[in-house]
Regions:
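N-terminal cationic and glycine-rich segments that engage phosphates or anionic surfaces
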Residues: 1-100, 105-434
Length: 434
C-alpha cells in the first residue's frame, strides 16, 4: 500500500493521474452521445444479430461506440491506420526517411501528416458506414430515419470530427497524463465493456445457451492467459556488459559489470493493434456495401475464420519485427557502449557488437511474435467456439494486461526518480528514501 500512498506525495504525478482519468472520462461520456438520424433500437437489434462477427470485433476497439453509432463510433483505429501507413512510407520514401532522422522537428512534421491521413481515412470509413446503414433494414427495421445525401455527409463529418477529437485526446493524455494516450483509450474502452460482457455471458447461462462447466472452463482459460501474458511481458534476455577501468589521477573509474536488458516483446501491444486495424479497414467497408460478394468477403475476415487468423498471425509477425526495428537500433546501442568504454565479453566493440545484438534481438523477437500470435489467436478461436464475447479473447486480454503493465511501469519510474517505493517492490534492497 505504501506505493499507492507515495503517489499522493508527488504533486506532478498526482496531477498527471487525475488528468488521465478526467480525459478518459470525457471519452467514455462521448461514447454515449449518438449520431443524429439513427434509430437506436433498430441499431441495437442489428448488433445483437452481429455478435461474434467482424462488427462485434470492431466495436470492441471502438469501446462500444459503433454499437450505438456514437460520435466516437470509429474509435481511434483511423489514427492507427494512418500511423501504420506513415511508418511504412518512412522506409520507402526518401523525403519521409530524412524527416524521421531530423529529430523533434522531423517527428512533428510526420505527426502532422499522420493527422491529415487520419482525417482522410475517417471520412472514407464514415461515408462507408453511413451508406451501409441506409441499406441495412427496410421499412419498420430501418436504422436510418431519413436516408439520403444529407445523412451521409452529416454522418461522415460527425464521425470524422469524433475521431479527430479522440486523436487530440490521446495526444493530451500522452503529453499531460500518464501512459500512452492512444493505447489507454483502447484499454478503457475494453475495460468499460467487460461488465456488460459478463452480464451477457450470465444471460446465456440463464437461457441455457451456455452451461456452467463452459463458464468455469473459460474463467480458468482467462486466468491462465493473463498469468502467461504477465510472465512473458516481464521476461528479458540480459546480455552481459563489462566496462573497462579508467585511471584519472589517483581515482579508478569504471570496471563494473552490468547487463543490457532486451525485452522478449519489445513491440508491446502495437502488433495486434496494427494487425487488427489493417484487417478491419477493408473488411468494415465491405461489411456495409450491399453486394453479395462483399458480404462474403467480410465473412471471410470474421475473427475465428481460417483466412482471418492466418492474416492476423502474418501481420502480427511482420509488425513485431517492423516496430522493434523502429524503436530499437543496435548500431546506436553499440556506439554508445563503445563511447563509454563498454563491451560484451568475447565480442569486439563496434560493428561486431551491433551484429551480435541484432542476432539476439531477432531471435527473441521471433519468440515474442510466436507468443503474441498464440495469445491472440488460440483463446479467440476457443471463445468463438462457445460464442463468448470478444472482450474475453486473447487480443483484448493482451491489450488490457500490456497497457496496464506499461502504465504501472511509468508510474514506478516517477516514484523511483523521486526516491520513493514503487508500486511493486522487487526486493528489500529497493526501499525508497523520503
Amino acid at each position: 500500500m505504501s506505493g499507492f500512498q507515495n503517489i499522493g506525495r508527488i504533486p506532478e504525478l498526482k496531477r498527471r493521474i487525475i488528468m488521465t482519468f478526467a480525459l478518459l472520462a470525457v471519452y467514455r461520456i462521448g461514447v454515449h452521445i449518438p449520431t443524429p438520424g439513427i434509430d437506436g433500437n433498430a441499431l441495437a437489434a442489428l448488433f445483437q444479430r452481429a455478435r461474434g462477427t467482424l462488427l462485434g470485433f470492431f466495436d470492441m476497439f471502438a469501446g462500444g461506440g459503433l454499437e450505438r453509432l456514437s460520435v466516437f463510433a470509429l474509435g481511434i483505429m483511423p489514427y492507427i491506420s494512418a500511423s501504420i501507413i506513415l511508418q511504412l512510407l518512412t522506409v520507402v520514401v526518401p523525403t519521409l526517411e530524412r524527416l524521421s532522422k531530423e529529430g523533434e522537428a522531423g517527428r512533428r512534421k510526420i505527426t502532422q501528416y499522420t493527422r491529415y491521413g487520419t482525417v482522410v481515412i475517417s471520412l472514407i470509413q464514415g461515408f462507408g458506414i453511413a451508406v451501409g446503414l441506409e441499406q441495412m433494414g427496410r421499412g419498420a427495421e430501418a436504422v436510418v430515419y431519413s436516408p439520403g445525401w444529407s445523412f451521409r455527409i452529416f454522418t461522415m463529418i460527425t464521425l470524422c470530427a469524433g475521431t479527430s477529437f479522440l486523436m487530440w485526446l490521446g495526444e493530451q493524455i500522452t503529453e499531460k497524463g500518464i501512459g500512452n494516450g492512444i493505447s489507454l483509450i483502447i484499454f478503457s474502452g475494453i475495460v468499460a465493456r467487460m461488465p456488460q460482457a459478463i452480464g451477457y455471458t450470465g444471460s446465456m447461462v440463464s437461457a441455457g445457451e451456455m452451461n456452467w462447466f463452459v463458464v468455469v472452463l473459460l474463467t480458468l482459460l482467462i486466468f491462465v492467459v493473463i498469468t502467461f501474458i504477465v510472465f512473458m511481458e516481464t521476461s528479458q534476455r540480459r546480455i552481459p556488459v563489462q566496462y573497462a577501468k579508467k585511471v584519472v589521477g589517483r581515482r579508478i573509474y569504471g570496471g563494473q559489470s552490468t547487463h543490457l536488458p532486451l525485452k522478449l516483446n519489445t513491440a508491446g501491444v502495437i502488433p495486434p493493434i496494427f494487425a487488427s486495424s489493417i484487417i478491419m479497414f477493408p473488411a468494415t467497408i465491405a461489411n456495409f456495401i450491399p453486394f453479395a460478394g462483399m458480404k462474403t468477403f467480410a465473412k471471410l475476415l470474421t475473427p475465428g475464420s481460417i483466412i482471418h487468423e492466418l492474416l492476423y498471425i502474418g501481420f502480427i509477425v511482420f509488425f513485431c519485427f517492423f516496430y522493434t526495428a523502429i524503436v530499437f537500433n543496435p548500431d546506436n546501442v553499440a556506439d554508445n557502449m563503445k563511447k563509454y568504454g563498454g563491451y560484451i565479453p568475447g565480442i569486439r566493440p563496434g560493428k561486431k557488437t551491433s551484429e551480435y545484438i541484432e542476432r539476439v534481438l531477432s531471435r527473441i523477437t521471433l519468440v515474442g511474435a510466436i507468443y503474441i500470435s498464440f495469445v491472440c489467436v488460440l483463446p479467440t478461436i476457443l471463445i468463438q467456439r462457445f460464442n463468448a464475447p470478444f472482450y474475453f479473447g486473447g487480443t483484448a486480454l493482451l491489450i488490457v494486461v500490456g497497457v496496464g503493465l506499461d502504465t504501472i511501469q511509468q508510474i514506478e519510474s516517477h516514484l523511483i526518480l523521486r526516491h520513493y517505493d514503487g508500486l511493486v517492490k522487487k526486493s528489500s534492497k529497493m526501499k525508497g528514501r523520503r
